[in-house]
Amino acid sequence: MGDVELTVFKRENDFYKRMLAIAIPITLQNLITIGINMADTMMLGSLGEVALSASALANQFSFIFLVIHFGLAGGAGVLTGQFWGKGDKESISKTLSMMFKISAVFSFTFFILGQFFPAQIMRIYTPDPSVIAEGVKYLRILSFAFLVQGFSTIAIGILRTVGIVKLALCSTAISFFANIFLNWMFIFGNLGAPRLGAAGAAVGTLISRIIEFLIIAIYLVFIDKRIQVKIKDLFKHDKAIFTDYVKHGTPVLISDFILVIGLNMLSVIMGRMGSEMVAANSINTVLQQFCTVFLMGVANASGVIIGNTVGAKEYDKAQDYGKTFLALAVLIGCFSGLLIFSLKNVMIGFYDVAGRTKDIAYQLMNTTSIIVVFSAVGSTLTKGVLRAGGDTKFLMKADVLFLWLLAIPLGFIAGVVLNLPAGIVFFCLKIDEVIKALWCTKRLLVDKWIKNVTLA
């Protein structure tokens, strides 16, 4: 047994160098993003549960937008990662241009919804009038960010598949410092700025998104030499690439869209349990993100390496790499769980919130420290290995099936009908992570997941 365990980690030195070269910049980028989220929740938490809950629930609508773009970029990344493995730069440029046009449609749609129907959106998540009122102000401002954020998300997601990861780190780092400073100004009214409360966080986020957009646009137009995006491709339609995207990328988009709607249903359930539950989950989410930040880097690296390897038609090597990434996910997941359990008291102590909110956060963190082992495996396989291997139709089932058939109904019954303790409710809401991890592990081990989607 020990020899088997040791063998799965035995890879050529280049494997781990490639993995770390991708994972470390992404990890640092995610750390910066988590820093923004933590600063936001701490600043807004000092204003009370209403402000914190309003921003958290309004951001669920933004989360739908973001995950749709993760789906767009992830679906395209299945193609571009394998295009890069076979050395087809022109197809990568055409794919990126095609995705910008599709993104523009979603960006404008979400802008209209957020600008003109914010109250209706907030009522989906909570019946609390004070939370709705704060959320409306937040969402109206944040909706302008949709017009630029889609472009940035698509560009970063696809550029990662060809090994360009430092751009995201650079743009995120600059926007991070801008966001923290601007939030401090507009939330509390410092340096002569108006005191806007929760809406001030939206102003800071909007300006930082614009800065991020400008950095990425300047890079693509004036600096990039690797894939050489052509402006003229924006005005062309490549039928072959579009057909490939519809066949292999659409399942990713559909699964991510249905998944995010399901995750929003979980937020609706928590919203019906009160602002304390919402605020506690915001605190728990920050700690979970912090403790799994390296895992997310490894999961992204797995997608790049597997996609490039499959594109180069090295299928046996891709299968071996997949098993190594699975083993790494288990190890990192266990470490993350221990870290969450160890840091929960310290983390909760940072927040100036009510005692009941702290009690709920404590319960959620206990549950998360167990669930995170399974979510580590699930994230690495669904967003990295299996997706990059082209097994997108299987993943559409894995991402959606258990969330809608188990987690949402069980969570609703436990939280809204039976009013069970928060920790038990949270476990019910996350039960799909456990089953998905086991199902995807079985899929990986039967070696039926590799599909070269770039073959003519």
Each model region followed by its residue ranges:
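Short alpha-helical transmembrane segments in multi-pass integral membrane proteins
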Residues: 1-23, 80-145, 193-250, 306-371, ...
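Transmembrane helical elements of multi-pass membrane transporters/channels
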Residues: 21-40, 141, 152, 175, ...
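Helix-terminus/linker motif at the lipid-water interface of multi-pass membrane proteins
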Residues: 31, 35-53, 122-129, 185-196, ...
